[in-house]
């Protein structure tokens, strides 16, 4: 049996118990325990430099798929049109 196993409740999957145990380990107990928190990521200095980064170069977006452009000659695109 694991040393860090949470007490089991019949019919509850093991993963649920492990998740509950993990959440319990992350909680801070009592005043002055703020240093026990896990470090935030990204650190504030790194997060600030990311916000100030220049935007990526804008590439024109293609609105049409690959291949030939559609025909513009009405006679070719609509066979029901007859010459006058």
Curated annotation (Swiss-Prot):
<feature type="compositionally biased region" description="Polar residues">
    <location>
        <begin position="75"/>
        <end position="84"/>
    </location>
</feature>
<dbReference type="Pfam" id="PF15354">
    <property type="entry name" value="KAAG1"/>
</dbReference>
<dbReference type="GO" id="GO:0006955">
    <property type="term" value="P:immune response"/>
</dbReference>
<protein>
    <recommendedName>
        <fullName>Kidney-associated antigen 1</fullName>
    </recommendedName>
</protein>
<dbReference type="InterPro" id="IPR029407">
    <property type="entry name" value="KAAG1"/>
</dbReference>
<feature type="region of interest" description="Disordered">
    <location>
        <begin position="31"/>
        <end position="84"/>
    </location>
</feature>
